[in-house]
């Protein structure tokens, strides 16, 4: 990573890290509030969980680079690290990651074939559950949860607890549109939400999720960074920190100890 950092700095090219959690509309609003109030972030909790990936290679280390921690945990982790960067800039402080502790496992291994029918995850040599505890240099904390064992759709959020505010960023699901259906007639081509096998009963429908989840803001920021020759909001420093934390987390889980920086 340090060699890559050298290349980026020497070439003067723009490195754009596609972390949609940074650009998710509730996270962007939370960042605005944190900067305005100069909030000290004491504890954050973020999660991305679902019933497993639709990718046939998600369960293979040599195809994916890890399990649910790598596939989904990077998103809330990256979002929380970015928020910590916003806090540091607003308060004119330098805040770094001090230590990482992690536990991973394969919770679905205990299921019979019939019991497994609702869970898509098929881990071979990767984890289907992971939790990371991060301690920052100012003594504050962040907790990241990632799991392939959660039914009911995709669960994405960041909870923020500071000295002068509490902010809950609900990315998915949201309450913009709650739907109730007794049947699915006429709904064959209507998308309600992700990772739900049926549309019956009450559901929390996706409404402009490409905007709320940050995909549009991400692309707009990257294009404007090129057009106006400025740095993107999500760049190399965030990619570097996120990768460092994720790999330290795997080392922590493997060795059964806290990793200090």
Indicate where each model-derived feature is located.
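A general structural signal for well-ordered alpha-helical segments in protein cores
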Residues: 1, 27, 76-77, 219-220, ...
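C-terminal helix-rich "cap/oligomerization" subdomain common to oxidoreductases
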Residues: 5, 10, 186-187, 207-208, ...
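Predominantly a Rossmann-like dinucleotide-binding segment in NAD(P)-dependent oxidoreductases
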Residues: 11-16, 21-123, 256
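Residue-level signal for the nucleotide or nucleotide-sugar donor/cofactor binding architecture
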Residues: 25, 71, 155, 214-217, ...
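Mobile, glycine-enriched helix-loop/loop "lid" segments at the mouths of ligand-binding/catalytic clefts
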Residues: 45-47, 103, 173-198
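A short glycine-threonine-serine/GTX helix/turn-capping micro-motif
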Residues: 64-71, 205-213
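Contiguous beta-strand/loop segments that form the cofactor/metal-binding neighborhood of enzyme cores
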Residues: 78-181, 216-229, 248
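C-terminal "lid/loop" region of Rossmann-like NAD(P)-dependent oxidoreductases
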Residues: 194-210
